[in-house]
Curated annotation (Swiss-Prot):
Coiled coil (residue ranges): 200-274, 412-505, 580-611, 636-669, 702-731
Entry function: Part of the Rad50/Mre11 complex, which is involved in the early steps of DNA double-strand break (DSB) repair. The complex may facilitate opening of the processed DNA ends to aid in the recruitment of HerA and NurA. Rad50 controls the balance between DNA end bridging and DNA resection via ATP-dependent structural rearrangements of the Rad50/Mre11 complex.
Native organism: Thermoplasma acidophilum (strain ATCC 25905 / DSM 1728 / JCM 9062 / NBRC 15155 / AMRC-C165)
Name of the protein in its database record: DNA double-strand break repair Rad50 ATPase
InterPro entries cross-referenced by the UniProt entry: P-loop_NTPase (IPR027417), Rad50_ATPase_archaeal (IPR022982), RecF/RecN/SMC_N (IPR003395), Zn_hook_RAD50 (IPR013134)
Sites where the protein binds ATP: N32, G33, A34, G35, K36, S37, S38, Q137
Length: 896
């Protein structure tokens, strides 16, 4: 992995910092608290989303709502861009992530980004990657400290060997837990032996009871056969008795039914005698001549009424014919006046229709005349108000303007001047703040120098002369800073006064003066356009106004009063003629009515000759005899129904008497069978008693067998369950032995020792390779399994404490690079955080030389990023970057 670029937006103290890296050595310098380590934090955040603060949102710069980190790097022949962001929310912060590969987006969520990095970029565990790439502050010093135990602990942590030793202790807990699970194995085996003895005893009892059950089941079978025979005999006798009893009951029922029918016949004869008088009266009426001719007599009275109606109709028709002829004559006399009236009326209707069509235009014409006059007056009012407002604005601003556009331009110019002044003031305040911060830092460093001769930044011993020179330098810087601050504050005060004047004018205009002036301008233009439109509209309808006045004059000059009455008389005459309709049809109707009158008179004469006393046979008389017949008809129908019922009942009595003969013989046979049925029932009950006793005995034995078999099943289940537990525990017992052997492998002399030996050999070889390029005063070096470092001078082994400061630094650096390459064979990036911490000047200079002559060669490690507050290292850098704190924010620039 080679990092090309990283950008920090609102990340910790960085507002917007972009850092470009290259292969070789990249050194980032700056004072403590300047924001150097934030760049390493940003790299870890980009790769893993790691945070160094308690809450992830605390990494957002104070006053900002969100942060963003974007890192571009190369890996495996591809170019990657990782972008992560955090946004403050009311409850939980919102995190987002995105990965692009060669310009194409691959993931759009935090989870997808983390999964992709783990599987395709890091490939190893996160801890291994971090331990190989990142060297924490103080590690270089720990690797060369005089305490072997401390050095061993540090390398164990980097190589994660302590996790293997933790596994040794964990496996002890696993073994103890497994041992607890098999503590009752012997008890389970003894319990199974005791249950097997009980099982054999219960099985013998079941066999004996089964033999007794077989014997009693044979007895039960014989008794069931006897019961079946007795039951068959009893059922046959009972069945015949039931049939005989049913036959007797049926015969008695038939005899009773015949008696009831004979009683009903006697009742019918009585009813027929009661209605004989009604029958005789019915026959008398229906056989008379008047009843037979009742419809003709009723028609006679109808004809008498129609004769009167026909005579009235003939008189009415004669009157209509005379009216028709009179009105035809009157209409002919008024025809000429009628035609003249219609001609004049049509012309008036035409004029009225045209006036209706033109009335809208006439109204619009009059309305436009009035509106044009009103709008001209309003336009003059707006012109006067705008002039008064313009004079007021000019006096306030102290400058004239010709129109609204010029006024807006003046307002925008004032706002731009205010923005420029604000920018100038902000820049001045930033400069003043930076100078005051620098002043405070100088005073703090001067206070730290009082009574001490050590560098307040790195703790280097300066001596008396060095301390004096630094104090003099600090005093000169303070005087220069105070003069510069005074000058900047005077400049800010003058600019601020100009700002107040501009804000006063801007505030005056912002209260709506521009909008009011523009409104008058717009209103006058709108009115001018409206007046023009109205005048154009007026010219287009002027000819319609002229035509309207001409037609109105013509309409008012026309008079129809003299002709209107004659026109009305003609219409009335024609209405009478129209109501009468076809005169020829009316005359034909007269002939038809005359014929109907003659036919009716002929029919009445015929009836009167046949019935001389016809006046006695009025319609009410005919209705009366018809009503009497209708009243008698139900009695006649009842007599007929009763006669039919009587004949039917006589036939039924005859049939029932025939079917109920022979009852005595059947009763005798029934008595004989009753005795036989009683004997069969006694035998059947005896056999059933014996069967019940046998079944009771069998039920008890079978219940006992089921109980015994249930005990057998329970015992077999217990034995089976224990066998499974015993088998499982034996497997656990075997597993315990296997785990014990595995635990031994994780012990001090097992896998950790093998790893330490492997690491020891690798570190020794790699350290020799790196140190061979240095001109050091010893022959060889070795790192043993406990990570003790031994050097050889002339073949004589010596401890690391025998080395000089520079030699220790070279050894520590070589071991750290070797450890990184052991963890990551493809190591292309190494990040060192404050490697000079706790190093004296000699060892810092040695480290600078090592970096220049070793790491600048990109064949060892292609890219190295170093964070330090010691500028001495810049001489060995391919890329030099400086971080400063200005106005509370970190600023990144190229180092001088």
């Amino acid at each position: 992995m080679i990092i090309d670029r990283i950008r920090l937006i609102n990340f910790l103290s960085h507002e917007d910092s972009e850092i470009f890296f290259d292969t070789g050595v990249n050194i980032i310098v700056g004072h403590n608290g300047a924001g150097k380590s934030s760049i390493i934090d940003a790299i870890r955040f980009a790769l893993f989303g790691d945070k160094r603060t308690k809450k992830i949102e605390d990494m957002i710069r104070k006053g900002a709502k969100s942060l963003e980190v974007e890192m571009e790097f190369r890996h495996g022949g591809h170019t990657y861009i990782i972008r992560r962001s955090i946004t403050r929310r009311s409850k939980n912060p919102e995190s987002n992530a995105m990965i692009m590969v060669d310009g194409s987006a691959l993931s759009q969520s935090v989870k997808d980004a983390n999964d992709y990095i783990e599987k395709n970029i890091i490939t190893k565990s996160k801890d291994v990657f971090l331990n190989s790439v990142f060297s924490k502050q103080g590690e270089m010093d720990d690797l060369i400290s005089g305490d072997p135990a401390r050095r061993k602990k540090l390398l164990d942590e980097i190589l994660e060997i302590e996790k293997l030793e933790e596994t040794y202790d964990v496996l002890k807990d696993v073994i103890d837990s497994l041992q607890a699970g098999i503590s009752n194995l012997d008890y389970l085996i003894s319990e199974n032996e005791r249950d097997r003895d009980d099982l054999r005893r219960y099985q013998d009892d079941v066999a004996e009871l089964s033999k007794q059950i077989d014997q009693e089941e044979a007895i039960e079978s014989d008794l069931l056969r006897k019961k079946e025979e007795a039951s068959a005999e009893y059922n046959a006798v009972s069945k015949e008795l039931i049939m005989l009893d049913a036959t007797l009951k049926n015969m008695m029922s038939l005899s009773d039914e015949a008696n009831r029918y004979e009683e009903e016949i006697r009742k019918i004869d009585g009813k027929l005698q009661e209605i004989s008088g009604s029958t005789e009266r019915y026959n008398e009426i229906t056989s008379s001549k008047v009843y037979a001719s009742r419809e003709r007599i009723r028609g006679y009275w109808t004809d008498k009424g129609q004769i009167i109606d026909y005579r009235k109709m003939l008189k009415n028709i004669d009157g209509q014919v005379q009216s028709y002829e009179d009105n035809m004559k009157k209409a002919a006399e008024l025809q000429a006046d009628h035609d003249q009236y219609e001609i004049m009326q049509r012309r008036m209707d035409e004029i009225k229709h045209e006036l209706d069509d033109l009335r809208t235009y006439e109204s619009k014409y009059v309305s436009l005349i009035n509106e044009i006059e009103q709008k001209k007056k309003k336009r003059e009012e707006y012109r006067k108000k705008q002039k008064d407002l313009g004079d007021e604005i000019s006096r306030t601003l102290g400058r004239a303007f010709a129109n609204a556009s010029e006024l807006v331009a003046i307002y925008e110019e004032i706002r731009r001047d205010i923005d420029e002044i604000n920018t100038d003031l902000g820049n001045l305040q930033v400069k003043i703040g930076a100078l005051r911060q620098k002043e405070e830092e100088i005073r703090r460093n001067m206070n730290m120098l009082e009574g001490h001769n050590k560098c307040p930044v790195c703790g280097t011993d300066l001596g008396d002369e060095g301390s004096r020179r630094i104090r003099e330098h600090y005093s000169e810087d303070l005087n220069r800073l105070n003069e510069e601050i005074d000058h900047l504050e005077r400049e800010a005060s003058a600019i601020d006064e100009k700002k107040r004047q501009l804000i006063s004018m801007e505030s005056y205009l912002a209260k709506g003066k521009i909008r009011e002036y523009e409104t008058y301008d717009r209103q006058m233009k709108d009115l001018e356009a409206q007046i023009t439109d109205d005048e154009n509209s007026l010219s287009t309808i002027a000819y319609k106004h002229t035509k309207y006045e001409q037609l109105d004059e013509e309409y008012r000059s026309m008079h129809l009063e003299d002709l209107r009455q004659k026109y009305t008389d003609w219409n009335n005459a024609m209405a009478v003629i129209s109501n009468i309709g076809d005169i020829e049809a009316l005359r034909k109707q007269k002939d038809e009515v005359s014929k109907k009158l003659k036919d009716a008179e002929d029919r009445t004469h015929e009836i009167e000759s046949e019935f001389p006393d016809i006046n006695s046979y009025t319609p009410s008389y005919i209705g009366k005899i018809e009503d009497e017949v209708r009243l008698l008809e139900p009695q006649i129908k009842l007599a007929e129904d009763l006669k039919r019922q009587r004949e039917t009942l006589r036939e039924k009595v005859k049939d029932l008497r025939s079917r109920s003969a022979g009852m005595d013989e059947i009763q005798k046979r029934k008595n004989e069978l009753s005795v036989k049925a009683s004997e069969s029932e006694t035998r059947l009950k005896y056999v059933e008693g014996q069967i019940q006793a046998t079944l009771s005995s069998l039920s008890g034995k079978r219940s006992k067998v089921e109980t015994l078999r249930s005990h057998v099943s329970e015992i077999e289940q217990r034995i089976s369950d224990r066998e499974r537990d015993i088998e499982r525990m034996k497997k656990i017992e075997k597993a315990i032995n296997d785990v014990k052997r595995i635990r031994e492998a994780f012990g001090k002399n097992g896998v950790p020792a093998m790893i330490r030996q492997s690491v020891s050999d690798y570190l020794t070889a790699k350290t020799r390779d790196y140190l061979s390029s240095f001109d050091l005063d010893f022959d060889d070096i070795s790192v043993d399994q406990d990570f003790n470092v031994t050097v050889y001078r002339g073949g004589v082994p010596e401890g690391i404490d025998s080395l000089s400061g520079g030699e220790k630094t070279a050894v520590a650096f070589a071991i750290r690079v070797a450890v990184a390459q052991f963890l990551n064979a493809d190591l292309s990036l190494l990040i060192l955080d404050e490697p000079t911490a706790f190093l004296d000047e000699e060892r810092r200079n040695s480290l600078s030389d090592i970096i220049e002559y070793t790491l600048k060669d990109s064949s060892v490690i292609p890219q190295v990023i170093i964070i330090s507050h010691h500028r001495e290292l810049l001489a060995s850098a391919n890329v030099a970057i400086e971080v400063k704190k200005i106005g509370g924010r970190s600023v990144v620039s190229n180092a001088d």
